[in-house]
């Protein structure tokens, strides 16, 4: 049997939910749109999995964090899709795609055809087994991407109360999971190869604050080395992590967060690629007519910096999906929409900490404020200056208005005459823009 739709979204993550909402706003008719997802649940806000989902008390659970609550919008329950005439194909994995013929095939043999396709397949976690790490297939080595992953991890946390946890990776997932494990009053060690945490974004000064804060919370941090092997007990459960520097760590549970890869293998050789993703224009149109790509998989023009980027973050997943849906409907009636003009935005929350970053982290940096990890209420930030202009801004502990101010600075790119004066002014500089 062939299922025919005017529009199909392949992928059921954050982008799918926000695209569906925008399709409805634009006037999609019942029966025109389908979402095909290999997950068993309707689109949800993925960031919850490394935060509130694992809280020791009152943990978040579906349906509480279906899209689009993450941006303050309506929660789109499965019934919402039914009411709007949107077909959800859950637990359905697409195994082949013919973009020229506009044809998809699922693992269970279902066939789909479409007029317009939105690729929203997101990223897959990088696994240590991909690199042939010895023992990396032992039980109780976890990765976190989907609700099923979080459920398995949560069960292990509750089952092994006095276990030793090792978190491999010093990025978003590593930092957020280490914090939530500590909130569960667990023994936690972080291991990562870089000289400091979050090296793609943080300066050494910013990282020093978070590493100090985590250490004060009792988290052991081991930097500059990697896991090269694991040993298991007679039940096949992990018991040790072997590090490249020769150290061996006891571990009953290991959580790996070493990044992701965009899931574009279905479309290899059919679409133009760039920077590891699918090349798109400012409307997320690909090189193939009537095919769009959004979220993690899209490499798009970053107008603000006259550059081309691929961005793995929930904010872009939401906004790119909305842009594509608007562009699709505009094209259907011979109209156009404004080009995507994205301001890069990243954020994280852990313990009592909350930071936001806007813009580009290139050039000279200026640190301001109180970045002492022992402070009762730390509040500090950093500006990035390139060619005499502020191009990026970071703030820990900001109020909503202060966070809006640093976003405004990053967008406006004001000139800086004296970096020492900028350091003295700190947040007040942003408030004046």
From Swiss-Prot:
Which cofactor(s) does the record list?
FAD
Q: Which Gene3D superfamilies match?
A: 3.30.390.30, FAD/NAD(P)-binding domain
- According to its UniProt record, the EC number is 1.6.5.4
How sensitive is activity to pH? Optimum pH is 7.5-9.5.
Q: Which residues bind NAD(+)?
A: 170-176, 194, 200, 259, 312-313, 347
Q: Kindly list the places in or outside the cell where this protein is found, as annotated in its UniProt entry.
A: Cytoplasm
Top EC class, one word = oxidoreductase
Its GO CC terms are: cytoplasm
The entry assigns this protein to a family as follows:
Belongs to the FAD-dependent oxidoreductase family.
| Name of the protein in question | Monodehydroascorbate reductase
Show the taxonomic lineage: Eukaryota, Viridiplantae, Streptophyta, Embryophyta, Tracheophyta
